[in-house]
């Protein structure tokens, strides 16, 4: 692929993701960036909201300013919207070099969003090159290609610390009621102890309590020996095991995860997965959108498959 991108001087890692409409452009960029020696962490292809949120989550969780993101969907707008749901992520859809320079200069953009429909690989390289080389507060089209005035420069300096706090949880003041540490050590456990659980009819042995409707979050319990037949969801989900032991087979990726107390697992949207509970297990789960479930096999088929693997 032809293009103007040159090797980056400083250590740099780019986390990438796309939906079906942006997959080809994303793959082309991944191949080229790796050829330049840039460390690329590719999260693959999923729905635009899952792709954007997964890249945003990983960039947000990084402690390094040199970890950035690159996301692609049909328009470049959807992936940017969901990447921006995470603190410290400043995603911008850039259709031109000018967009990229403005986004870096003004907003310190750290996630670049491309349109797989509108942007060619050659143009994407030019946009990326401008984006990666433009420092914060540098002259840009919005400044008339001149240095920012001292007033605006001061504003931009202050904006970094102020923007980074948006979306973060804030500590309560002196009037906030404190949790009694003698009865509960974490908020999730406190919620679980004081809520009624509803049986999950489609999953024998399971019960759940929804603690937020949209995006859906819930505390879920399964009895030892329970099996979740292969199924999938419209939205990806994160879960943390509070107590117990379970095995999750991601049939889409042909991977297995054995989880115990404190373990975390993310399952992308649409991935078909099967679950076996080895002990009474309780976990917290949150979806990227509204909860739903679609079965891909019956219970007996699932049990037989697990027995054959054992």
Curated annotation (Swiss-Prot):
The lineage of its organism: Eukaryota, Viridiplantae, Streptophyta, Embryophyta, Tracheophyta. The keyword Transcription does not apply. This is DNA damage-repair/toleration protein DRT102. One of its GO terms (molecular function) is isomerase activity. The gene is DRT102. GO terms for cellular component: cytoplasm; cytosol; nucleus. Residues 219-282 form the Cupin type-2 domain. Keywords: Acetylation, DNA damage, DNA repair. It comes from Arabidopsis thaliana. It holds the Pfam family LacAB_rpiB. The modification N-acetylalanine is found at residue 2.
